[in-house]
Amino acid sequence: MSEGSGDQSQQRPWASPRQQPIKGIVQPRVLPPFGKPTRHTNKLDYIMTTVLKEAGKHKHVWPFQKPVDAVALCIPLYHERVARPMDLKTIENRLKSTYYTCAQECIDDIETVFQNCYTFNGKEDDVTIMAQNVHEVIKKSLEQAPREEHDMDVYWGKNKKKPAKSDGGSKSSSSKKNDARGPSEAPSEAGSEVSSVTTASAAAPTVSESASVAAKPERKVAGKKTGKRKAESEDDEKPEPLRAKREVAVVKKEVHQPLLPSMKPCLKLLNDFSTKKYQEFAWPFNEPVDAEQLGLHDYHKIIKEPMDLKSMKAKMESGAYKEPSDFEHDVRLMLRNCFLYNPVGDPVHSFGLRFQEVFDRRWAELGDSSSRASSVAPQSAPIAPTPKVAKSSAPKEPKESRKEHKKETTFEASGAKSEDLMQINNALSMIREREEKLKAELAAAQAIKDKLTSVKNRREDNPNEPFPEKLINETRALCTTQVGQNASSSSASSAALRNGRSKKAASARLYGYEFDSDDEDNKMALTYEEKRNLSNLINNLPNNQLNTIISIIQRRERSALMQQQLDDSEVELDFESLGDMCLREMGAFIKTIPTLNGNGDDEKPKTSSNPTSSGATGSKGSSSLESKNGKKKKNFNMSESSDDETSNSRKRRKRESSESQSSSSSDDDSDDEDRPSIPRKSGQPPSTSREWNQSSAPPPRMGGMGGQPPMSRVPASSSTSVSAIGKNNAAASSNSYQAPKPAPVPAPTSSRPPAAPRPPSKPKKTGGASILDTLLPDTFGASPPQFFQSQPTTSATIRSPTESQPGNGEDEQTRIQRMRMEAKRARQKEDEGSVSLSNQMEMMAAFEFDNTY
């Protein structure tokens, strides 16, 4: 580029110097500098009138019509790599100001435009391809340029067509003046005029002059008559072309007459997409797709019904669109064709997305514009007929004015109803889209029905055929999706007219549970512990119950689950993204599920050996304490782990170590085996090493209020159930810590027999658990909260949550609110005098390390 620019500067001494960009734009000079020779030739005129105009009609010419804005396009290195920026608009302005001396200078500037594009952009860039297309058009036009170049007068600007107009005007004015002055002037003047005319045409004798002078008065009258006749004939001939023009204008009005007032906003929207404002992304849709020119041989095989903006405009002008929904259908069809043929990531696909975004926004604004137009139209309606009636003098004219008045009133009435028509058309389009979706769903259901029928027939013949679990899951997913859509659509449509409780309750009853979305309790936000317990319960659900959970999420939160996630084998749910109503409904569904069996996941109630920790006694004691004091101390267990395997292995090692010790301390050791060590309130570890005999085990993981929750929960064993609470508030479990002092443990009367083998199932606390154990199960090792799990029974029947109402006469909502407040107060009071969990864990680990090494 540097050598080429040096050669050009040597050959063209008047070339414009390199300029610095101003706000990212370099505008080359347009006016010729002082002393530069300029001229206008026939070849330059051909470039200005033909070449540049044909290039300006190309759809890819828009990036080259103005100087490059490096700031707006975020290309700061453009002016460093491009020495002489140039554009087609600058070339056109130079031609108009006679900047060039020959056509070759103009052609060099045109070549500079495209060479700059090829230099800065890559070979496969979209702008490079567009530049090649425009360059080919200009080359073809230059092939037809005149070969010989000669000078030519400038015929534009201030001197545009002045000489031709002045000559013709003087001649016509002089002839008219002569015609007008001829009959009114004196005979001598007329004679001189006639003689001058005759001498100009041919030589005449002097006798003819006298004869002409003698006959002048008659010629005056004749001249007057002929002049009048000529004037009348001219007046008669002049209105004829005007009438013809008026007739043509009327024909054009008749062409646009079928355009309804409701279609005027659509026409305006269509014209807006043809402007430069939207051509950045709308240019691929301006004209029909030329598959042969673009090399798209499979386009018409994939796209059965092509559509473009030009075809839509032709249909709009011909009155083919009767409703705005027809216009919207064609726009949607054009965009569907774009998305169907062009894959994701293609530039045309991205242009289609931008076009769709702008169209949706503008289409939503059409209702407001039509309402404003309808509000303005009735104001001007009564004013129009008054001047027509005043001007009417003949009896025929009032009829015409009445007809026009009727037409205006009909158009105004239709304009006033345009908003209603727009809403009706939108509703019709929604119904049509719904019909298409239902047809697709019906086809899918029919296919699944055929498969199920064939499987049923085969199983009747061969009972040993494997069960089609995948087909059953597809059927459930299809049915639950349809139920969710129907429920959401029906509730949305009837929300303004009637209560939607029956619709949602009906959808919930299909799965055997009751859920009232209008209840205030179901709208309350879930706490962190409630979400964690719900997550654990969902993880333990069988596969056949997970489909109902997915259907609830689809019905409540459509954006939470995508079809892509449903196709995968595993679906991850983020509870933070789900709504409170969705989580409450999932909790209501889980409450109706009977007790799970097998794999150690079931949680069955087990009574304690201690009679004071029975369900009735515990419930009475806790209720009496709640009624007297109104608050309860928090039971905090330091030795309870959140891992089942860690807890079982630690207890097994404790039993083995206790059995290996002396018989003199066997009683105490056996008592300590089943009762984990009790840490002190200050957070210090126990004083004896026997309480931490399981030093080889890893430190227990605590499920605390300030840290992350454990992944699983270990319920308390039957021997560590909560005992009854006395008057001094000293009731405590054998493995838990209570303030202000622990409950006394009765001394054993005899040596304890060896511990019996424990069942593999995880034990569970009875109904006598404390309030904190009920509300915060994972923190203190209790069972799940009662509002997420019904009382387990041996039967597998599905029960409604109304069956487990408290029998003490207290409202369920009041009880839950009271329990929450008590738990909050107890947690605040305990946190004030306790050490953080992290410090406790560090001290426990240090103590175990010292005892071990």
From Swiss-Prot:
Tissue localization of expression: Expressed in T-cells, Q-cells, V5-cells and their descendants such as somatic gonad and syncytium.
Domain of life per record: Eukaryota
Compositional bias ranges of the Polar residues kind: 1-19, 684-696, 786-807
The keyword Transcription is annotated on this UniProt entry: yes
Comp. bias (Low complexity): 166-175, 192-215, 369-381, 612-624, 708-736
CDD domains assigned to the protein according to its UniProt record, in alphabetical order: Bromo_Brdt_I_like (cd05497), Bromo_Brdt_II_like (cd05498)
Keyword Coiled coil attached: yes
Result when mutating residue 315 to R: No effect on the interaction with smo-1
Primary location recorded for the protein, binned into one broad class: nucleus
Effect of residue 313 to R: No effect on the interaction with smo-1
GO terms for MF: lysine-acetylated histone binding; SUMO binding
Start and end residues of each NET domain: 516-601
Domain spans labelled Bromo: 39-145, 257-366
Cross-link annotation Glycyl lysine isopeptide (Lys-Gly) (interchain with G-Cter in SUMO), location: 252
Keyword entries, A-Z: Bromodomain, Chromosome, Coiled coil, Isopeptide bond, Nucleus, Repeat, Transcription, Transcription regulation, Ubl conjugation
Region (Disordered): 1-22, 141-245, 369-418, 594-814, 819-838
BP GO annotations: cell fate specification; chromatin remodeling; multicellular organismal locomotion; muscle cell cellular homeostasis; negative regulation of cell fate specification; negative regulation of DNA-templated transcription; neuroblast fate specification; protein localization to chromatin
Disruption outcome: Abnormal cell fate determination of several lineages. T.p daughter cells adopt a hypodermal cell fate instead of a neuronal cell fate resulting in the loss of the phasmid socket cell. Generation of ectopic PDE, AVM and PVM neurons, and distal tip cell (DTC). In addition, ectopic egl-17 expression in multiple vulva precursor cells and ectopic che-22 expression in extra distal tip cells. Moderate increase in mpk-1 phosphorylation. RNAi-mediated knockdown further suppresses the age-dependent paralysis phenotype of the spop-1 gk630214 or dr95 mutants.
Function text: Required for the establishment and maintenance of stable cell fate in several lineages including V5.pa, T, Z1/Z4 and QR lineages probably by repressing the expression of cell fate determinants. Required to maintain non-distal tip cell (DTC) fate of somatic gonadal cells through the htz-1-mediated repression of transcription factor ceh-22. Regulates the subnuclear localization of histone variant htz-1 in somatic gonadal cells. Plays a role in the attenuation of the let-60/ras pathway, probably by preventing expression of activators of the pathway. Involved in adult locomotion.
Family: Belongs to the BET family.
Swiss-Prot/TrEMBL domain comment: The BROMO domain 2 is essential for the interaction with smo-1 and E2 enzyme ubc-9.
Subunit field text: Interacts with acetylated histone H4. Interacts (via BROMO domain 2) with smo-1 and ubc-9.
Name of protein: Bromodomain-containing protein bet-1
Organism: Caenorhabditis elegans
